[in-house]
């Protein structure tokens, strides 16, 4: 059931999306930062999806709210991703690691790659050896969506990411 506060916004969004002549429809979310309104956000995306049938949902990162210690960060990040994954009816969900999606200590470099492991089974996704960056091909539209990372544990961007992107 749609939150009544957002009924007007949802109706306007449906109308706007349906009036566009584009073929690719993406539900785009960013900076949820463990917000208490995240369930309502997912509910609203789902309500719009029922009418427009999004091709996927993309979350541009910052699921968390800054550095959180170790395993607690992993638990919170998995909860947030699990909350957003079913936002669109076809289940296609592509998260990006934001600069606040980190944690402290040795666990940090494993956190994001482990959490997005579900992408390895997603059709059309190419993710090099457990890296936080990847791309997905949307075959029906002949589109490649490239997702880079604004927080890379081993190094800040640099040569490996550039080499990978040139080989795509």
Predicted regions and their residues:
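N-terminal active-site segment of His-dependent metallophosphoesterases
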Residues: 1-74
């Amino acid at each position: 059931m749609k939150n009544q506060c957002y009924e007007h916004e949802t109706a306007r969004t449906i109308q706007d999306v349906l009036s566009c002549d584009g073929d690719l429809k993406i539900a785009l979310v960013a900076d949820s930062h463990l917000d208490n309104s995240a369930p309502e956000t997912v509910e609203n995306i789902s309500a719009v999806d029922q009418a427009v049938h999004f091709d996927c949902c993309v979350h541009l990162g910052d699921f968390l709210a800054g550095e959180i210690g170790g395993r607690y960060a992993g638990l919170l990040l998995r909860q947030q991703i699990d909350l957003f994954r079913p936002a669109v009816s076809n289940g296609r969900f592509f998260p990006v690691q934001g600069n606040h999606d980190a944690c402290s200590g040795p666990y940090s470099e494993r956190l994001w790659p482990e959490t997005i492991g579900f992408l390895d089974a997603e059709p059309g996704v190419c993710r090099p050896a457990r890296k936080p960056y990847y791309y997905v091909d949307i075959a029906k539209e002949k589109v490649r969506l490239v997702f880079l990372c604004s927080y890379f544990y081993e190094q800040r961007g640099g040569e490996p990411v550039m080499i990978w992107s040139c080989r795509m």
